[in-house]
């Protein structure tokens, strides 16, 4: 701890042999006199200054035990949300359009949304896309669906598992995490965004990310639109932070490169986001090498999803 010396002491001994005093000149303008024999009585102990501010971190975990937000209702489906797991679709409703929780707000003014109130302050609302609010247009959905059975990566029914990851848990052994669907259009206007509900700028230090099962399946096997990954392929996740004055900062992470499955970010991988600086929001998009050009727009071929968990905020 730093100590600030409020009184600077100057000790000036008189040089003449006959002089036996020390004079202490204090910063308040006074002078104190001490005999040489009493010099040990002079105290140089500085008073303690103010403590440096302690920088603390808070973590968005999506765990029910860490839920501090107020109860609210998703009006379009009548679901009361008191804890994070209330935002998780049923395990048998992962297919496109199957869950009223993440699909029934199409052509509606209501939307799936959540906020880490009274903790990190991070919040998310489904973006408006394709005429409404729906996970098929992008969004961040809470999930707890995990498997360690790699047979899923050969299951042609993979589209019924779009909220699953090939792990035995969330990051750091947790139960819940978020799955994000990235609109496949290249340079889309629609963004998957985390915002601070208080409107102030904060530093997002890091988060954990991994590639969900549905994207892994298509990277390994291809589908009707994409090819299996080869040496020239890559999968990248990009974060764009927006500062209070509107300036942007960017950081990215390479989730996969080439066809070496063992090197891909299948396990939870810590991503350092501190270089974004203090931001009021951060948006995410994904990029890959495989692109279809339809003239009016370009689209990535592979269904692009990512999972994230344990977001650390200062």
Question: PLM features: residue spans?
Answer:
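Short N-terminal segments immediately surrounding and downstream of signal-peptide cleavage
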Residues: 20-35, 62-66
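Terminal, low-complexity interaction segments
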Residues: 60, 64, 232-314
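N-terminal targeting leaders for non-cytosolic proteins
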Residues: 53-189, 199
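Short coil-to-beta strand junction motifs in C2/discoidin
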Residues: 218-237
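N-terminal targeting signals for Sec/Tat export/insertion, comprising classic cleavable signal peptides
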Residues: 26-48, 73-82
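Low-complexity, Pro/Thr/Ser/Gly/Ala-rich linker/spacer regions in secreted
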Residues: 41-58, 314
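Bacterial Sec-dependent N-terminal signal peptides
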Residues: 1-23
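Extended extracellular/luminal ectodomain segments enriched in beta-structured repeat modules
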Residues: 199-206, 278-279
């Amino acid at each position: 701890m730093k100590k600030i010396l409020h009184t600077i002491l100057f000790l000036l001994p008189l040089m003449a042999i006959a002089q036996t005093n020390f004079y202490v000149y204090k910063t308040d303008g006074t002078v104190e006199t001490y005999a040489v024999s009493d010099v040990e009585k002079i105290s140089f102990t500085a008073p303690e200054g103010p403590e440096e501010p302690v920088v603390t971190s808070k973590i968005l975990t999506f765990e029910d035990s860490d839920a501090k937000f107020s109860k609210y209702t998703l009006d379009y489906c009548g679901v009361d949300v008191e804890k994070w797991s209330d935002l998780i679709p049923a395990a048998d409703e992962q297919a496109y359009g199957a869950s009223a929780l993440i699909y029934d707000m199409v052509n509606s003014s209501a939307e799936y949304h959540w906020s880490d109130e009274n903790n990190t302050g991070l919040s998310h609302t489904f973006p408006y896309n394709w005429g409404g609010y729906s996970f098929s247009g992008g969004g961040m959905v809470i999930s707890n669906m995990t498997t360690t059975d790699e047979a899923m990566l050969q299951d042609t029914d993979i589209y019924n598992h779009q909220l699953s990851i090939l792990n035995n848990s969330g990051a750091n052994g947790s139960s819940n995490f978020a799955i994000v669907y990235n609109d496949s259009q290249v340079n889309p206007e629609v963004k998957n965004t985390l915002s601070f509900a208080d409107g102030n700028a904060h530093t997002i230090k890091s988060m954990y990310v991994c590639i969900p099962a549905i994207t892994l399946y298509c990277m390994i096997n291809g589908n009707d639109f994409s090819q299996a990954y080869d040496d020239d392929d890559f999968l990248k996740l990009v974060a764009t932070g927006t500062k209070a004055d509107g300036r942007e900062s960017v950081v990215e992470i390479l989730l996969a490169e080439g066809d070496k499955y063992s090197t891909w970010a299948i396990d939870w991988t810590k991503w350092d986001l501190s270089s974004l600086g203090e931001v009021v929001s951060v948006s995410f998009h994904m990029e890959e090498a495989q692109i279809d050009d339809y003239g009016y727009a370009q689209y990535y071929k592979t269904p692009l999803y990512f999972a994230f968990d344990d977001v650390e905020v200062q």
